[in-house]
């Protein structure tokens, strides 16, 4: 019997190590002809280079080159930290998250959604340590850090896995696109990269949507809770006032969309933003939602309590500091007459039979608006050119040069409120509807004195105390 000496034991160990190494080299080399069929999945995975960076997926820590390392993108439901087994596929498109450049199928690529808007860093195309992670997403070569995906609405779902990143009920896919140029996903993915064909110029280009930023602030609309910067939350403007539903705070299916905005968990409809004036801009992107020439930012607030936008947004949620209130509250839209729509959606705010379009734009008090609707909106902000002033393509101004509505808007009697909110414009004690002498429902054509000023704007009219109901008793009695 051969005696084992320390030298012989060392030699046998070395031989064993050599054999194991040889086997591993054989298995992970480019030739897999001798691998049994049951291990064929290893052949495919080891040969595949999803992002074409020259590093096989088997040793690439970021297979889809989105900057988010695979161990983050695989939610690891089986606990083995291996994206090959039971891989996570958030959007159920057949492409696992770690191979999917658009994991939530909203058209915005994960590399964009994982980063802050103003701190965005594009891939450098350099990978010094050959681990598959772009150098721009490692502090030092080999550190393997990768992006730490942001969660804009703090709902525990990072934006790249959240179909409603700002929690306003409007899908990111809708907010990332212009209204006129909107394209829904086609459901085709020719190159199998997880990005819908509608959002690639050509298969494999991986372009994705370039998210729209309506108000030009620090956040694109899909991360902006007030996309037009009028102080009214998108969640409010996207819905009818009468049927408004706030978020319930529940998300049964974990897709990032509040349950109030899905018919059933997983259906993912979201809100269909309303467009009150049927112009090219839905209300949440329209600074004048009902086309009366008065900006929503003005009409959403009281005249005496009007607060200008500050131009600051410390928490980077898209809502101006002036309207934050407590917990991103935004403005609570004013409703002067208390009977129908809030003022920013009400074409006759004071219910006096004279439209706001007239009362808010009649500076010479002749019953005819000095600025009239043209049907053209050169700067596409939702405010018609007729009300823009001299510069039709001015920088984005949510209040359109109105700094103090109490002095900047028509107010015939100088008391109570400006005309579009004053039931008695001339302060003669007769409500404007009662000065409709001919009873045709239009006080603007009643000029009893013939002086060119309609009675409702003329406190000195000779018929300042009519009997509009014909009962023999003057209206003022």
Regions of interest found by a model, annotated:
Residues 1-46:
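Sec-dependent, cleavable N-terminal signal peptides
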């Amino acid at each position: 019997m051969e005696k084992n000496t320390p030298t012989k034991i060392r030699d046998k160990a070395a031989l064993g190590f050599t054999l194991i190494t040889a086997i591993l080299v054989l298995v992970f080399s480019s030739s897999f002809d001798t691998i049994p069929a049951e291990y064929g999945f290893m052949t495919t995975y080891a040969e595949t280079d999803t992002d074409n960076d020259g590093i096989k997926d088997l040793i690439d820590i970021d297979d889809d080159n989105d900057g988010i390392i695979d161990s983050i993108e695989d939610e690891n439901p089986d606990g083995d930290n291996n994206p090959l087994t039971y891989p996570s596929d958030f959007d159920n498109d057949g492409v696992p998250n770690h191979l999917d450049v658009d994991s939530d199928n909203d058209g915005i690529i994960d590399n964009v959604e994982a980063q802050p808007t103003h701190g965005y860093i594009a891939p450098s195309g350099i990978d010094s340590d050959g681990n598959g992670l772009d150098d721009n997403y490692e502090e030092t070569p080999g550190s393997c850090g990768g992006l730490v995906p942001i969660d804009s609405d703090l709902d525990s779902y990072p934006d790249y896995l959240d179909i409603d990143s700002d929690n306003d009920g409007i899908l990111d896919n809708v907010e990332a696109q212009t209204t006129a140029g909107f394209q829904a996903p086609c459901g085709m993915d020719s190159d199998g990269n997880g990005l819908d064909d509608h959002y690639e110029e050509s298969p494999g280009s991986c372009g994705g949507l370039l998210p729209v930023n309506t108000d030009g602030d620090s956040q694109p609309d899909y991360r902006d809770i007030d996309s037009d910067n009028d102080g009214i939350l998108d969640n409010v403007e996207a819905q009818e006032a009468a049927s408004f539903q706030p978020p319930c705070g529940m998300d049964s299916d974990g897709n990032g969309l509040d349950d109030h905005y899905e018919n059933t968990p997983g259906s993912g409809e979201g809100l269909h933003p309303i467009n009150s004036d049927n112009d090219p801009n839905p209300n949440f992107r329209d600074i004048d939602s009902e086309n009366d020439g008065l900006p929503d930012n003005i009409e959403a607030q009281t005249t005496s309590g009007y607060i200008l936008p500050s131009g600051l947004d410390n928490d980077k949620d898209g809502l101006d500091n002036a309207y934050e209130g407590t917990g991103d509250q935004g403005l609570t839209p004013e409703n002067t007459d208390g009977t129908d729509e809030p003022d920013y959606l009400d074409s006759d705010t004071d219910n006096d039979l004279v439209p706001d379009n007239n009362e808010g734009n009649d500076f010479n008090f002749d019953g005819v608006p000095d600025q009239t609707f043209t049907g053209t909106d050169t700067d596409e902000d939702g405010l018609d050119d007729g009300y823009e002033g001299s510069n039709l393509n001015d920088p984005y101004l949510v209040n359109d040069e109105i700094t103090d509505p109490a002095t900047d808007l028509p107010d015939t009697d100088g008391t109570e409120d400006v005309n579009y909110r004053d039931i008695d414009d001339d302060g003669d004690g007769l409500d404007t509807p009662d000065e409709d002498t001919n009873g045709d429902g239009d006080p603007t054509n009643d000029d009893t004195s013939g002086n060119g000023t309609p009675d409702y704007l003329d406190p000195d009219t000779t018929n300042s105390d009519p009997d509009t109901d014909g009962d023999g008793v003057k209206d003022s009695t």
